[in-house]
UniProtKB/Swiss-Prot annotation:
This is Preaspterpenacid I synthase sttA. Isopentenyl diphosphate binds at residues 493, 496, 525, 542. Mg(2+) 4 binds at residues 532, 536. Residues 431-447 have a biased composition (Polar residues). Keywords: Isoprene biosynthesis, Lyase, Magnesium, Metal-binding, Multifunctional enzyme, Transferase. Substrate binds at residues 105, 255. Pathway: Secondary metabolite biosynthesis; terpenoid biosynthesis. It comes from Aspergillus terreus (strain NIH 2624 / FGSC A1156). Mg(2+) 1 binds at residue 105.
Length: 773
């Protein structure tokens, strides 16, 4: 405690005697601190709220549907506890930033994500503005903000509330450009991460992992670096990431605890309960706990993580030297953010609502509504009312060698995920399926072969010859589909679907055809990923094991080919079943494989040809299919075709760069994985063209035992060589130049086809400014 207090300069430990009544629902064990500048924060929030309401009136946003509850509560201000050590001169702007983020984000309709105190608004989002209006507001804000950041081009927003929001961010960056830009990078990363997955049919461990990655925790921490003027490098952050993730996990689960009734109410009224993402809901749905049981588990999990953080911080402090002072401030700020947020949530009106339309009985309908088997939570007793929600009597359950309860019928095929066992398999599902397999499939009972039901109908028996002349029976598809189903379940941003929707603003493809094109592109993309991972010998895909590590190379290839054939069949059902771009995809991949097999470094010109066919081919396929199906009769637009070709190049070169320079990419694919693959990426081609010792590099890359990764020390050597010849700097220059050309190509396309704010915001959002900062 002394070590933590010594770091604080502008706050004091909270005096609980100052609060009457005390928040009865506060259970966090962290020390809580209070800013000395609370009055300034409250005053700034009040003034900003008045201006925001006036802006909403000008923009035609109905006040009766926007319940503005700012950071201020009856006990004080959110920031006085969450950012207690904020520099005095930054208190007012920080309060405005918090309210701006809360209000602006809070107008969004329910989207399926779990709200988080560090990024969302204390407003009733289920009664907020329409999705169409919110999309218009988002594009207006995004184009104005990203244009200024990426190209220095100042575009004034059309909406008054966006003018206020953009000005707040301008002021934020002007005060401290270093931490201000870092904050925007984390904000964008948070928004990107939210789009990757939902949490249905997910284990508790996997849920916590995903929430840490996709929540606003890192965004809130980046704001704390700005408020406290903390200067810390990415390497220093990485060295204590285990502690910041512990803190974030506790804060996220605390938010789930307090926000569950409100979130359930919002999703219930909007008809999106299947998209409710909350730890309490997950424990009820996937594990069968009651709301009270689930909340007690959440409490324990929060306290466990808080104790681990305190112990970990003490251990770190004992071995940390005087040069780690800034890291110490960073860690204490992170803890204070979670501690203060927990104190605020324990009494804020946002969570302690009396106007909810739903009741505890309504929330109880979630219990046991998993998509498959109920799970068993390691370290906790089973739900007390388990007998009342399972589809089979508990008496038929058995225990495995680890003491986990499982149903007899599920033992043979139960899976273990992160130590949590699938148990209590549901039976008698539709279409004759049982436990996820066709009812007619062959099985073994007591070591004896049991024939499919259809064969038994023909009077066959174990010793009968009739099975050899029985009618044709189509094989079940589940085994062939399994590898594809696995990769399809992995988190994804679904950028291609978004791009298709945005292109449709220009091309006007009928809904049924657009749906088929999306399915074609989705199947082709996932099929190519399965094959790419085999051809590249990749162990990871999107941070998870690659498909072939589970299903083997042969079965994965078979599944990928099966899906590819199905995609081609879907293409033939469209008006223009031209397969040119499908051929180009394979020709591009063949170049990549040929260069690797023969260890031949291509020229930059050859590299671009490969990219245009392999990566750009899928983009052009999307365009050609949509043009053929368009309700607007026009030939393939050359400007739009060029735009998508440049987009494919930018995607690939950005991917090449991130493979070597991004910590996030490293966590998903491994450290410099392109070196393991022997892939001739743009950085490697540049290095081999400029280093004095190209033979050393190629010898290390291509004279290895098959299936072995390049040693870590050799990867560091290659990176050092790249540093010497400025390879990564060159890659950055290429990205900057290519992005400028992308925006020029977009200008030309809009001149021909009309404005497309959605595509403009997408291209601005993937620009190099936030990528390279």
């Amino acid at each position: 405690m002394d070590t933590i207090s010594d770091v604080m300069k502008h706050c004091v430990p909270i005096n609980y005697d100052d609060y009457d009544p005390l928040p009865a629902d506060h259970f966090s064990t962290y020390p809580v601190f209070c800013s000395k500048a609370t009055a300034e924060a409250i005053e700034a929030s009040a003034e900003f709220t008045r201006k925001w309401k006036r802006a909403c009136e000008v923009d035609g946003l109905h006040q009766d549907k926007l319940n503005f509850q700012a950071c201020t509560t009856h006990l004080g201000h959110y920031n006085q506890w969450a950012y207690p050590d904020c520099l005095p001169e930054r208190v007012s702007l920080n309060a405005v930033l918090s309210d701006c983020a809360f209000f602006w984000d809070g107008m969004s309709p329910v989207t399926g994500r779990s709200t988080n105190v560090m990024i969302t608004s204390p407003v009733d989002v289920s009664d907020s503005i329409s999705a169409e209006k919110m999309n218009e507001l988002t594009q207006d804000f995004g184009i104005a903000m990203l244009s200024e950041l990426q190209s220095g081009r100042r575009i004034e927003p059309r909406f008054e509330i966006n003018k206020m929001a953009v000005q707040v961010i301008r002021d934020f960056i002007a005060v401290d450009p270093f931490t201000g830009i870092g904050h925007l990078k984390e904000w964008k990363g948070h928004l990107d991460a939210q789009e990757k997955s939902t949490h249905n049919n997910m284990s508790w461990e996997k849920y916590v992992e995903h929430r840490v990655n996709e929540s606003g925790g890192n965004w809130g921490i980046s704001v704390g670096c700005w408020t406290n003027d903390i200067r810390i490098s990415d390497e220093e952050k990485e060295s204590v990431k285990y502690l910041t993730q512990l803190a974030c996990a506790g804060g996220i689960l605390g938010n789930d605890y307090y926000s569950f009734p409100k979130e359930f109410d919002e999703h219930h009224r909007s008809g999106t309960l299947d998209r409710l993402q909350n730890g309490v809901a997950l424990l009820m749905r996937e594990y069968g706990y009651t709301e009270e049981e689930a909340k007690e588990i959440i409490k324990k999990e929060v306290i466990i993580r808080e104790k681990k953080w305190m112990d970990g911080f003490d251990a770190w402090s004992r071995q940390a030297g005087p040069e780690t002072g800034e890291i110490r401030r960073y860690l204490v700020m992170t803890m204070a953010l979670m501690s203060g947020s927990m104190f605020w949530m324990s009494h804020a009106g946002r969570y302690h609502r009396t106007d909810l339309a739903t009741t505890a009985e309504d929330r109880a309908t979630l219990i046991g509504k998993s998509r498959g088997a109920l799970r068993v939570l390691a370290g906790y007793p089973p739900p007390k009312n388990l007998e009342g929600i399972v589809r089979e009597p508990l008496a038929s359950a058995v225990q495995d060698d680890n003491g986990h309860v499982q149903h007899k019928d599920a033992v043979a095929d139960s899976s273990v995920r992160n130590g949590v066992h699938h148990a209590f398999k549901k039976r008698n599902s539709r279409n004759g399926k049982q436990n996820g397999t066709e009812g007619s499939k062959s099985t073994f009972t007591n070591g004896n072969y049991v024939q499919p039901a259809k064969l038994q109908q023909h009077g066959t028996s174990i010793n009968s010859m009739a099975i050899y002349t029985a009618p044709f029976q189509e094989a079940a598809g589940d085994i062939c589909d399994a590898p594809y189903s696995y990769i399809d379940s992995l988190p994804s941003k679904k950028n291609r679907n978004k791009l298709l929707d945005l292109l449709n603003d220009w091309l006007q493809v009928p809904p049924s055809s657009l749906k088929r094109i999306k399915n074609i592109v989705h199947m082709l993309h996932n099929s190519s990923l399965m094959l790419d991972d085999i051809e590249d010998a990749s162990a990871l895909r999107r941070g998870q094991p690659a498909t072939h590590t589970f299903y083997g190379i042969s079965q994965t290839i078979n599944s990928a080919n099966y899906v590819y054939v199905h995609a081609v069949h879907e293409v033939t059902r469209l008006y223009n079943p031209d397969a040119d771009e499908l051929r180009n995809l394979h020709r591009g991949q063949s170049l990549d494989l040929y260069w690797r097999h023969h260890a031949r470094c291509p020229s930059m010109e050859e590299y671009i040809v490969m990219v245009d066919n392999k990566t750009g081919g899928l983009f052009r396929l999307m365009l050609r299919l949509m043009t053929a199906e368009s309700s607007i009769s026009r030939p393939l637009d050359t400007a739009l075709c060029r735009l998508l070709t440049l987009t494919g190049r930018y995607y690939q070169i950005r991917d090449d760069y991130l493979n070597l320079a991004s910590a996030d990419y490293e966590s998903k694919k491994g450290f410099c994985e392109d070196f393991d693959e022997g892939k001739f990426s743009l950085p490697l081609i540049h290095l081999l063209s400029h280093t004095r010792y190209p033979d050393r590099i190629t010898s290390a890359l291509f004279n290895r035992k098959p299936g072995t990764n390049l040693p870590y020390e050799m990867k560091r050597y290659i990176l050092a060589e790249m540093e010497e010849v400025q390879t990564l700097a060159y890659s950055q220059d290429v990205l900057k130049y290519l992005h400028e050309e992308l925006m020029h190509a977009l200008d030309e396309t809009e001149n021909r086809l009309g404005a497309n704010d959605g595509i403009r915001m997408m291209l601005l959002g993937m620009g190099p400014k936030l990528l390279l900062c």
